[in-house]
Amino acid sequence: PVLDYHVHLKGGLTKEVAARQSRQTGVNYGLAINCGIGFSITNDTELYNYLDTMRTQPFILAMQAEGREWVTTFSEAARNSFDYVFTDAMTFLDHKGRRTHLWVNKEVIIDDEQAYMDMMLDRICSVLEEPVDMYVNSCFLPDAMSDRYDMFWTEERIDRFVNALAKSGKALE
């Protein structure tokens, strides 16, 4: 079977539309809900309520763990209620303690691009130690840096990332 592990219900994609598309294409969907501070699901009660509405649907259910505090925001029992859990390193505290969402340009404050890249790689390697099954959006760069991808993702940095990933035993999207 073919499976897309990272599908979100948004932009007009409802569970009904997703089910129909899945049947038509033969691709099974892992539906993910964003869970964390400032996201769709922010506590165990909301998480269980969401799961109650989805258990009868023809999908594998995933938790996309957001922010680095998700491990303490949600109980282990609640997290384990999903079929699998994945995360990325796109929400974190930067080197000055500012909450950063890498896709929100105004939150990405870069003084020194190479130092910022090193900080992002540190965050990625730390995230790989979190209790998840899969790491996603693996090498995302903010808009201010994305046009020079090869300059920032050097062989040395790639090696560090790949070694940390291998050590973690996690799947990579």
Give residue ranges: language-model regions.
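An N-terminally biased module of ancient metal coordination in phosphate/nucleic-acid-related enzymes
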Residues: P1-E69, P142-S146, D150-E156, R160-F161
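Active-site flanking residues adjacent to catalytic metal/cofactor-binding acidic residues
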Residues: Y5, M63, T87, V136-N137
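Conserved, mostly hydrophobic/aromatic
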Residues: H6, V85, L172
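Short, acidic/polar
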Residues: G12-A19, E69-A77, D118-S126
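Structural alpha-beta junctions
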Residues: V27, R55-T56, D83-Y84, L165-G169
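Hydrophobic residues within beta-strands of alpha/beta enzymes
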Residues: Y29-G30, V85, Y135
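Active-site gating/metal-coordination segments in enzymes
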Residues: N49-A115
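Domain-core and long-helix interface of multi-subunit machines
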Residues: S81, A89-F92, H101-E173
